[in-house]
Amino acid sequence: YDGQHPNLFSPKEEVPHDEFTSIEDINNYLLQHPEVINFIKSNAVNGDMGKALFLMFDEKTEQLAKAIGLDVCFPSAQLRMFLDNKVNTNRIAEKAGVACVPNVLSPVTDYKHLKQVSEKLGESLVVQTPFGDSGHTTFFISNEEEFNTYAEEIIKEKEVKIMKRINCYGTAIEGCVTQHGTLVAPL
C-alpha cells in the first residue's frame, strides 16, 4: 500500500540483520526496529503501548515486546511450544476423549524398531516428528527404502507419532479458549 493504508505500518528503512529462518525471527527484527518502536510509542494511549498478537513467537519476542511496553495477548511462548508439539497434543486429545487416527507414540531407532512398535497399525504408516510446519515433518512410510529417506529426522527425535495411514479429507481445526468457553471451528 506504499504507506497509504491507515491500518498498516511497515518500516521504510531496512536495518542490518541475520538471515530470517522463521516467522519468530521476523517478529523479533520488527520489535527491535527503531521505526516500529517509534510508531508504537507514538500511538500509545495514556502511556499504554497496547497489545500485540503474533502468528508465531518465542521467549525473545515476549522479552522484546515487554521491553517496549507491549502486552502479548497469548499464553506464554513456553505453553505455546508445549502445545505445538504433536506428541503432546495427541496425548491431550486422547485424555479429552477426542477420537484420533490409530497411533502409537514412541522413539524409533531403525526401520525394524518402527515395524515392531507399529505392528498393529498395518503396513502403510504416517510418522510425524513433534514439531514441523505445513507437512515438512510428516513422512509416509510403507517400506524400508521410504524410511531410509527420512531416517535421520525420525531417529533424532526423543519420541514421534506413528499413525495408521488412512484416506481422509484434508481440513484444519482451530481452537481458542476464552473466558466464555472453548471455541472450535474448521477453517
Name each model-derived stretch.
Residues 117-126:
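Acidic/histidine-enriched active-site and ligand-binding environments that engage anionic O-linkages
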Residues 13-20, 102-110, 139-142:
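Short acidic-hydrophobic, aromatic-tinged amphipathic segments that line or gate anion-handling sites
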Residues 141-187:
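Phosphate-binding site of ATP-dependent enzymes
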Residues 71, 99, 124:
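Residue-level detector of anion-binding/catalytic polar loops
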Residues 65, 89-94:
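Structural element of the ATP-grasp superfamily
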Residues 102-103, 125-150, 170-172:
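Glycine-rich phosphate-binding loop of ATP-grasp-fold ATP-dependent ligases
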Residues 92-103:
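A polyampholytic, Gly/Pro-enriched intrinsically disordered region
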Residues 1-82, 111-112:
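ATP-binding N-terminal substructure of ATP-dependent carboxylate-amine bond-forming enzymes
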